[in-house]
Amino acid sequence: MPATPAYPPHSAPRLYVDVELSGGTEIRLDGSHAHYLLKVMRIKQGDPVKLFDDRTGEYLAHVTALGKRDLILSIDGKTRDREAVPDLWLCAAPIKKDRFNWIVEKATELGVARIMPVQTERTQGQAIKPDKLRAHMIEAAEQCERTALPTLEPLTKLTAMLEQWPADRHLFFADERIHATGEGSFRSALVANAGPAAILIGPEGGFSDAENEMIRALPQSVAVSLGPRILRADTAAIAAISLWMAGRGDWNVMKSL
């Protein structure tokens, strides 16, 4: 048996597996995982692999047996516990397929806890394919070294989402119209509204007047400005997540908030 590797190099492959892991056990990989390791990475016996399970954390394993279409890994031990996930949801109207996939990938990288596609009056995106969106989330988490995956909710109508909105969760929504009034500072909103939060991003063309009224009527809603320029939906989503993570999340940038 090969010697147990030290902590894996940064170049070690890293994969999500949908099974609870523990040190001192073995795991068999086949399908897409095996194809990636065997055909793409050209992995060899004894090579290190990082695994995470979205349950307990990240583990170091090494290859003990190779087949044509599968391989066996021995799990040496845990390298990190599952991360504490900032309590931020992203509620976003679907846009063109590739750009919405990009939003999901980047929201995962930035650390959100939950992603909820929202159907609005002006939503023009194609039908949501949950399996493909989840695949984008997993790939993003593997690459950015997250140990937790966001929860992916089914497509929900805006009206239904607002009717069922949790009483203890702030809903920050981007409204480009309020910047000219001098109101809607995101920093001020973060100072005044600590606790569980969500960011609501509308479709290309924004929310309808009726939808704006419904959102503003929600006691937990907080209108915010993302600056003097009109942002595309995908840009707005990433900008808003970044501002929240800097002020209230785990970036520890605005420590005075």
Outline where the language-model segments fall.
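RNA substrate-binding interface of SAM-dependent RNA methyltransferases
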Residues: D76, R80-E176
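Active-site/ligand-binding-proximal alpha/beta "capping" segment
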Residues: L171-M214, Q220-S225
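Structured adenosyl-cofactor binding patch, chiefly the S-adenosyl-L-methionine
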Residues: D209-L257
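Structural motif
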Residues: R14, E26, P48, D70-I72, ...
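Fold-independent oxyanion-binding glycine-rich loops
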Residues: V19-E20, G31-S32, D54, P94, ...
